[in-house]
């Protein structure tokens, strides 16, 4: 079993199996979504990964929702909007 902070994307921890990211990029490449809504930001690694995939297809933005006010994103990306609470 992997530890929670073992895997990172550009230095930001994410809690996913690495093969999940392959499926995410495939879906994003094929659909070029205008909007991705993510619930549960935690550290933001998956959020940042999704933003980078949207950069590659030149489309879309992400709204991420986190209930814990202590989990505000520690980075900025123009495609990401975070709501807390």
Language-model region placement:
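N-terminal, positively charged/glycine-rich alpha-helical extensions of SAM-dependent methyltransferases
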Residues: 1-4
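S-adenosylmethionine/decaboxylated-SAM
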Residues: 7-85
């Amino acid at each position: 079993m992997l530890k929670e902070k073992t895997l990172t994307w550009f230095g930001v921890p994410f809690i996913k199996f690495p093969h999940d990211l392959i499926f995410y990029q495939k879906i994003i490449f094929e659909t070029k979504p205008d909007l991705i809504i993510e619930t549960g930001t935690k550290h933001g690694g998956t959020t940042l990964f999704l933003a980078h995939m949207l950069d590659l297809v030149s489309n879309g933005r992400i709204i991420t929702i986190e209930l814990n006010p202590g989990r505000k994103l520690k980075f900025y990306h123009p495609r990401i909007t975070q709501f807390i609470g």
